[in-house]
Amino acid sequence: MFAVKVKICGLTNYGDAAAAAEMGADMLGFNFYPKSPRYIKPADAVKIIDRLPAFVDIVGLFVNDTFGHIEQVIDECRLDWVQFHGDETPKYCEQFGTLNVRTMKAIRVKDEKDIKLAEEYYTDAILLDAFDPKKYGGTGLVFDWNIIGNISKRVFLAGGINAENITKAVELGIYGIDVCSGVESKPGKKDHAKMRKLFDMIQDLRG
């Protein structure tokens, strides 16, 4: 039996968000990075968030954004989590400790040195994603999970997670998984059949 949190990221419409929540998602992610194909304006995200059940945590993804703008979106969208998915430093992330929000730093992993970097961040969680020189997340790439080792923080695993590799991901003993492109029909649009298959498998693993 495995207890693992499930985060569905890159949501752009109510139908996908509601379906993810109904299927069992613990966290729903909205991408506020304008250059992403999954970008959603905060004003549009609010319209979706307002209709979602209270039991799901709302996560806002940002890339190299300003403190002021992120603080504004936290208030506007009533975010539970802020996910830093760019080149944010530990010092930059620490300043959000004054706000009523939990924080998660994404580490884009190339090798074991990047895994060690996770220990430098005093965030509520660490998200390990595959490195891509041109993209900040949502690439569908998978890094070598065997190098993860022991990290003294809550670890979310991202990068190409789907129904085919979910069992191996969960067996790593991580805190949560972050799924985006693995359950999409195209960037920003979820494939509900893929989501259902994924959640059915997770339910079996949870026991």
Where are these regions (language model features)?
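Conserved N-terminal beta1-alpha1 strand-loop-helix module at the mouth
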Residues: 1-207
